[in-house]
Design a protein with these regions (language model features):
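Conserved ABC ATPase "signature" region
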Residues: 64, 106-124
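Short coil-to-helix segment of the ABC ATPase nucleotide-binding domain corresponding to the Q-loop/switch region
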Residues: 88-97
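Conserved ABC ATPase signature
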Residues: 129-133, 137
């Protein structure tokens, strides 16, 4: 399902990834383990499209997506820092991507409430600003936001931090 072939990523003269090759089959869970600074996050950001490699290809289901924009990849990501909007409500954070896809309000509402229940966020919590939640609750909001878009692939950067 996911194939990285000969991926090279550079930041200036620094080569962060050198000829990375990875194959992950459909249904598999895959973990990158390694010390800080070894390229785990860079690899995830390359898969999701936040970083474009200097060379090599990123393929999903045998389709080259190396130059496909982030919003067209249908890959979700939960960032290490969650990347939530702290002054927005939990509801609006989860609904953010759904609104960008221009779904109708009733459909957004149904999807937000359904996914919130799945990650154990109450209707009362949906009304709160994200900044009012604990770290664990914020992590669940980030997971819900990623799941709301029904991605084919879901990436977690430092999921236990």
């Amino acid at each position: 399902m996911i194939e990285l072939k000969d991926i090279v990523v550079k930041f200036g003269d620094f080569e962060a990834l050198h000829n990375i090759n990875v194959n992950v089959k459909e249904g598999e869970f895959f973990t990158f383990l390694g010390p800080s600074g070894c390229g785990k996050t860079t690899t995830l950001r390359t898969i999701t499209g936040f970083i474009e490699p200097v060379s090599g290809t990123v393929s999903v289901n045998n389709q080259d997506i190396t130059h496909v924009p982030i919003e067209k990849r249908n890959i979700g990501i939960v960032f290490q820092s969650y990347a939530l909007f702290p002054t927005m409500t939990v509801y609006d954070n989860i609904a953010f991507g759904l609104k960008l896809k221009k779904l109708k309000k009733p459909e957004i509402d149904q999807k937000v409430r359904e996914i919130a229940r799945k990650v154990d966020l109450s209707d009362e919590q949906l009304k709160k600003a994200v900044s009012q939640l604990s770290g664990g609750q914020q992590q669940r909001v980030a997971i819900a936001r990623a799941l709301a878009l029904k991605p084919d692939i879901l990436c977690f950067d430092e999921p236990t931090s």
